[in-house]
């Protein structure tokens, strides 16, 4: 969702992973720090039919953004949005308001929102609104990676019936790589009725 896109073997980290894994890439730089690009990254097996980048910046806080990608899979229009919300409650509320039009759009049959919400309270404003728009999101503990007690990272799926399983991956390597555990969500789109 958020990546420091430094050079790796003659290309950006994003492109390196996309090439190594045979994936398609959608990326958005939100800001630069010490000459490095920072931003959002979405890698996918399927080729998106459309991608868009959305500015979720708030006041003088660290710039934030979202990647939106539309796919056609098994005859369904699928929208995937990946983002990373800010640290303050006010910032997260504003970012949610900026993102809502893309989540409330009923053109896609299916919607998936993957995010580090920086929000651990299940009854927070952000999660209450998202439950109303997309339905419930299973909570898996992802932060801090060394002793995960908070569910900062979530995957919302609408309809939820397409979500087969969801888990946080907790290995020694993962814990060294990030302060958050990655979330793996498995979807079954073939069984969804139009």
Which residues make up each language-model segment?
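A short beta-strand-loop structural module common to alpha/beta enzyme folds
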Residues: 1-3
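Active-site regions of metal-assisted phosphoester/phosphodiester hydrolases
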Residues: 7-9, 15, 19-194
């Amino acid at each position: 969702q958020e990546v420091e896109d430094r050079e790796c073997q003659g290309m950006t980290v994003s492109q390196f992973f996309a090439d190594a894994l045979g994936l398609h890439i959608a990326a958005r730089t939100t800001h630069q720090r010490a000459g490095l690009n920072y931003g959002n990254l979405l890698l996918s097996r399927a080729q998106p039919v459309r991608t868009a980048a959305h500015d979720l910046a708030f006041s003088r806080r660290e710039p934030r953004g979202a990647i939106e990608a539309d796919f056609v899979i098994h005859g369904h229009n699928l929208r995937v949005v990946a983002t990373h919300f800010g640290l303050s409650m006010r910032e997260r509320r504003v970012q949610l308001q900026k993102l809502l039009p893309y989540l409330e759009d009923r053109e896609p049959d299916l919607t998936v929102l993957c995010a580090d919400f920086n929000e651990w309270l299940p009854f927070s404003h952000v999660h209450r609104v998202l439950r109303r728009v997309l339905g419930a999101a299973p909570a898996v503990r992802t932060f801090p990676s060394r002793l995960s007690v908070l569910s900062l990272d979530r995957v919302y799926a609408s309809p939820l019936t397409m979500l087969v399983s969801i888990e946080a991956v907790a290995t020694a390597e993962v814990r060294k790589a990030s302060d958050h555990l990655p979330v793996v969500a498995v979807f079954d789109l073939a069984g969804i009725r139009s």
